């Protein structure tokens, strides 16, 4: 038997205060009596996530989900994945809102006190926005990214025109290069550095 999740319909615009306790009644409640230790692990994972809701001055969206590595840095790749679990508790975790720190910085030119470590990380924005919508039914969010600001469309064209070696958003240079049959990419920038395919490819992996 698997873990049964009772997903609750909750609001999507709350701004949690990290100093308060995590209200676990607003989270999916797992039922898995054969292995209660796995349920404990589940709750421990949410506690860890709650500890990464961060408030910071000088950024477009605060609070946001922090990756727990460097306080002055955010990653597209990691934030996209965090959105996928934050969608189960949108009233508690600012997952989808955290994407605005990339949209507004890269596309709108808003000042930010954070570095975007690899701006050429895989752009799964459309995928995670859609998965968030399927879970929450938040049509206003879709209007915001697709119609009001056209963030997804604009990011596609921005990504296609990236120049290898540029380093506008952090000291880490872009490794992406558009080729006729795909992208020439680096192992770390593509997110494939811990896979047999990507390990040690040093910017010469063709997608």
Predicted regions and their residues:
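Bacterial N-terminal signal peptides
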Residues: 1-7
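N-terminal signal peptide c-region/cleavage motif recognized by signal peptidases
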Residues: 9-11
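The feature captures the catalytic groove of carbohydrate-active enzymes
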Residues: 109-120, 157-207
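Alpha-helical support elements that line or immediately flank enzyme active sites
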Residues: 72-102
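Inter-helical turn/loop segments and adjacent helix faces that build the functional surface
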Residues: 132-143
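Low-complexity, Ser/Thr/Pro/Gly-enriched N-terminal "stalk/linker" regions
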Residues: 15-74
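Short glycine/serine- and small hydrophobic-enriched flexible loop segments
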Residues: 84-88, 127-134
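Long, well-ordered core segments of solenoidal/helical folds
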Residues: 45-57, 90-112, 145-167
């Amino acid at each position: 038997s698997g873990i049964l999740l009772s997903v609750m319909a909750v609001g999507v615009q709350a701004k949690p205060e990290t100093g308060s306790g995590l209200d676990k009644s607003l989270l999916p409640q797992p039922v898995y009596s054969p292995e209660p230790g796995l349920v404990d692990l589940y709750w421990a994972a949410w506690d860890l996530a709650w500890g990464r809701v961060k408030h910071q001055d000088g950024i477009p969206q605060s609070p946001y989900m922090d990756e727990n590595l460097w306080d002055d840095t955010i990653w597209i790749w990691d934030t996209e994945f965090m959105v996928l679990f934050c969608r189960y508790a949108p009233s508690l975790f600012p997952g989808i809102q955290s994407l605005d720190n990339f949209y507004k910085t890269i596309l709108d030119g808003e000042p930010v006190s954070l570095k975007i470590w690899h701006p050429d990380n895989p752009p799964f924005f459309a995928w995670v926005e859609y998965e968030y919508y399927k879970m929450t039914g938040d049509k206003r969010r879709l209007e915001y990214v697709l119609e009001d600001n056209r963030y997804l469309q604009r990011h596609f064209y921005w990504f296609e025109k990236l120049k290898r070696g540029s380093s506008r958003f952090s000291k880490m240079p872009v490794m992406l290069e558009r080729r006729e049959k795909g992208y020439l990419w680096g192992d770390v920038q593509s997110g494939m550095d811990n896979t047999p395919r990507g390990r040690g490819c040093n910017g010469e992996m063709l997608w």
